[in-house]
Amino acid sequence: MVSYAGIWSRGATSDRRDPHLPEHTLLAIDAGQTGIKTRLVTAEGTAQEWLFPGVLTDRPLLSQLTTVVAEVTRVTGQAPHTVTFGVSGLTSADDEADALMPHPDLAGVHRIVVTHDSVTSFLGVLGDQQGAVVAAGTGVVTLGVGPEHSTRVDGWGYIMGDAGSGYWIGRAALDAVMRAHDGRGPATSLTSVVQERWPDLEIAYVALQSSHDRVRTVASFAAPTAAHAASGDEVSTRICHAAAAELATAVLAALRVTDAPADAAVGAIGGVFGSDVIRSAFESAVRAERPDARFVAAAGSGLDGAVALAGLESGHPLHERFAERTR
């Protein structure tokens, strides 16, 4: 897979033909909750990028996606031939594709490809390699690809899943602080962190439960937990090691279910892996069961993965995870 980021600047034209360029104008869309990133790539080798506000997963996706296509079409004066979508919060690629294709804002589009953003993240990180990619931020999702099949592990939300995520770590930190407060658990330096936000710990739970932003608030304690682990706080260290074990379990499950080779590639992305304590423990846990696993740096971004999605061969194991419509 070719990573266009870093090769094409906004509006720049290459002086040689890249064999990986699309045959027709391609609009790649990486629709995440932080922002909707787009890249328009032409057959002549030019590329332009735009950034739009992030996806709101509690609202219908259709209008949020069509608005982006309509705006790019307006700015460029011509509808793209192909549009690829990697979308956070997507529940059914087929249903979304069926709704997108006949929409008036896509009237000039001839082909669309729709998938969950875990797929475009995988393609951006590992390209066409077999292996697993775990993306751990506020939430977490792991995607595995083997010789014939692919699988999704976790990503089931903060109530039913997301083990090892930023929310999971933050929730464990708050639990540890309250255990230290009422005598059920050992003292922890995290207590001072929580008291910076809620000086009176005994009413903290009321403020948190009534907050409309409680998931993000809980997840915000993940970073200080990692920092305190690095400074030697035993409680924080246990939490981070437990998170690493959960993330490793997800990756190992993905590799096992897909019959990935012994030397499969493993990519770990997202803010949680900014912690050396977590990353090191995660890699050790994976290697304990998969000693030949290869930990690789990301080859590209989710937007690069959305570009690659357009050229994915029909027999690729990830083909079962996206919907394609043409006219």
Feature annotation, model-predicted:
Residues 112-120, 135-136, 163, 294-303:
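Active-site nucleophile and cofactor-binding loops and adjacent substrate-binding regions
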Residues 26-30, 80-84, 113, 122-124, ...:
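Short glycine-aspartate micro-motif
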Residues 62, 94-98, 166, 279-280:
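Conserved strand-to-helix beginnings and helix N-cap segments that scaffold or border functional pockets
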Residues 129-184:
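Glycine-rich phosphate-binding loop of actin/hexokinase-like ATP-binding domains
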Residues 53-56, 70-114, 123-126, 265:
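Short beta-strand-loop/turn "lid" adjacent to the catalytic site in phosphate-handling enzymes
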Residues 2-76, 125-132, 174-327:
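ATP-binding/phosphotransfer module of carbohydrate and carboxylate kinases, centering on a glycine-rich
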Residues 103-108, 150-157, 285-294:
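Glycine/charged-rich beta-loop-alpha catalytic/anionic-binding loops adjacent to active sites
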Residues 34, 88-90, 138-141:
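Short glycine-rich anion-binding loops that position phosphate/pyrophosphate groups of nucleotides
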